[in-house]
Amino acid sequence: MTSTPGACLPGYASHFGLNNIPFGIASSDLHPNPQSVTRFEDNVIFLADIEALQEIKDLPPNTLSQPTLNDLAALPRSIHQEIRTHLQTLLKSSSLPSKALEPLASIRMHLPMRTPDFTDFSCSADHVLNASEAMTGSRSSPPSFYHQPVG
């Protein structure tokens, strides 16, 4: 699933500075394959284009080129912090490679994670019984709970 180009509206540049470096998945005409990105002000940074990040010792090759963040998210928090620290250093010194930087208007965003299975715990019998007890004082499920979906 993708959004249309420019769907990340400008005007929120102040939310994306050195202290807020989020990870996402994007593509563009120059980067046609969805891959890991971050946002800085009104620009998107394609992480796979930054050679300094490839030198991070425990970062497996091609992790930042994947079409989802699953592989990156599975890594220890220390790796995420190291990526952010490298990015902060590069941004402070204005030494990001130009090929990694694209204006927000040219970007297509993609779903960041592949989620093959999903369970909504709020639909479970345990949750329904706990919620019932919290609201009414007694543990009971609605008469229709086992016959139709909750929601």
Where are these regions (language model features)?
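Glycine-rich N-terminal segment of FAD-binding domains in flavoprotein oxidoreductases
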Residues: 30-33, 46
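A conserved glycine-rich beta-strand in the N-terminal activation segment of trypsin-fold
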Residues: 33-39
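Active-site microenvironments in enzyme catalytic cores
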Residues: 2-28, 39, 51-151
